[in-house]
Amino acid sequence: HIEHFYDLKKKLKKLGRQDLLELAELDFSVLFHYGRSDLSVDYNGAVVGPDEVKQIINANEKFSQTVKGFRLISYEDAQAHKHLMFAIELEADSTMDKEQGQSLLDDIVAKLQDINLDFKSAHRTAPIKPEIKIFKCGEGIFDQSHQKLKNDYVWNIDCKRAQKEGLF
């Protein structure tokens, strides 16, 4: 995002960081660039992050009350083909049949194509399309043994780990 120097100056003064203002030689706007971190996956050259997916799920009234959490999983199969999987954890006592799961996947993919032009291009040319796998609350990759202090939204894993986790 872009922060005008005047606004940045007010914020720094409020935070008691006059020392930083004294270092400024020019009063141009500042561009904050957020690079790729470990909180994204690569899909055929496009970067897909959990915030995009979370917004899409939360905006869909049909699924926002049913989905407890998710993971973006990038994995390789035995032939070294890259896959993108949306692993979905359901709320307790919620169910989702195959047709509903496909509907959720279709919604996620369509919305990602709308908001992420790199994804749109990647999806069009990708030999393997995104997948979805639905898990009951606290089961599979969302069970107690996979719990961490901080939610683990992204997995970049190899074939051996994907097989061990039962992803294919």
Which residues make up each language-model segment?
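AMP-binding adenylation
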Residues: 1-168
